[in-house]
A protein has these predicted regions:
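Concave beta-strand-loop units of leucine-rich repeat
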Residues: 1-9, 21-33, 43-55, 59, ...
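C-terminal membrane-anchoring or membrane-association module
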Residues: 216-228
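Juxtamembrane/start-of-transmembrane alpha-helix segments at the extracytoplasmic/lumenal side
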Residues: 195-210
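Core hydrophobic alpha-helical membrane-spanning segments
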Residues: 210-216
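Short amphipathic alpha-helix with an adjacent loop that forms part of the alpha/beta core around
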Residues: 14-16
C-alpha cells in the first residue's frame, strides 16, 4: 500500500486504522509526527516512512515481522523500541538525531544500515555483534573508532565521509578485515568510501567492468556464430 506524498492524509489516519493484513506500507512525505495507527499492523514486513516528523517509535515495538524499515529524514532520537525487532534486514536511519544505537545489539539478519548524518553519533561499538552486516554508512557523524567492524566477515561497503576516523585507523581496519575474510574463505573486496570523489570513481569502475563484461560476452557470441 503506497500513500506517500499525500499530506492531506496527515490528520485523517485514526489510531484504530485496520492494517491487520498489510505487509508493505509507504507513508513517506506525509508530514506525520504520530504513527500510533501502525501499532496493530502485526503482519507488516516493509515500512517506508521517510521525510516525516516522526519522533516516537513506540508503536513499532511489537511489529516483529518487520524486515525492511526506512525512517530516514525524521526527528528520531531514541531507537529503543527497535530493540526486539529481530527480523530487521534493512534499516535506514540517516538524517535524524540519533546518538545511541545499542538497541541494534545482536541483530542477526541486519545486513544494510545507514546512519549517516546523525551528527552526534560517536559510538558504534554495538555493531561488532551485528554479524551479517555487509553495508554501512556512517558519513557525517562524530565516529572516531572503526575497530568494532574489524571482525565482521561479510562487510564489503563502508562509507566514512566527514568522520573523525584517521587514515591510519582505516588502513588497520582494511588490513584486519581482509585477513578475517581470507580466514573465512570469503573472496569479497572491502570498499571504503572516504570522499564523494572515491564514491564516484568506485561507481565508474563498476560500470566500466560491466561494460567490459558485456562487450566480452557479445564478442564471444559473435565469434561462435561466424565459426559454426
Amino acid at each position: 500500500l503506497d500513500i506517500s506524498m499525500n499530506s492531506v492524509l496527515k490528520d485523517y489516519l485514526p489510531n484504530n486504522l485496520k492494517l491487520d493484513n498489510i505487509r508493505s506500507l509507504n507513508i513517506s512525505g506525509i508530514g506525520l509526527d504520530n504513527i500510533t495507527f501502525l501499532q496493530n499492523a502485526k503482519k507488516l514486513e516493509s515500512l517506508v516512512a521517510e521525510e516525516n516528523a516522526i519522533k516516537d517509535l513506540k508503536p513499532l515495538g511489537n511489529l516483529k515481522t518487520l524486515r525492511t524499515l526506512y525512517l530516514d529524514k525524521n526527528d528520531i532520537r531514541d531507537i529503543g523500541p527497535l530493540k526486539d525487532l529481530d527480523n530487521l534486514e534493512e534499516l535506514l536511519l540517516y538524517k535524524n538525531n540519533i546518538e545511541d544505537i545499542t538497541p541494534l545489539d545482536g541483530k542477526r539478519y541486519l545486513y544494510r544500515l545507514m546512519l549517516n548524518d546523525n551528527i552526534a553519533l560517536k559510538d558504534i561499538n554495538v555493531l561488532r555483534t551485528v554479524q551479517h552486516l555487509s553495508s554501512l554508512d556512517i558519513s557525517n557523524t562524530a565516529v572516531s573508532d572503526i575497530s568494532p567492524l574489524n571482525d565482521l566477515k561479510y562487510i564489503y561497503y563502508v562509507a566514512v565521509k566527514n568522520t573523525k576516523i584517521s587514515d591510519s585507523d582505516l588502513s588497520k581496519f582494511e588490513k584486519t578485515n581482509m585477513d578475517v575474510k581470507k580466514e573465512n574463505g570469503i573472496d569479497k573486496k572491502l570498499e571504503i568510501i572516504t570522499t564523494e570523489a572515491s564514491k564516484y570513481f568506485s561507481l565508474k569502475n563498476y560500470i566500466f567492468m560491466l561494460l567490459i563484461l558485456i562487450f566480452t560476452v557479445t564478442g564471444i557470441r559473435g565469434y561462435w556464430k561466424k565459426n559454426k
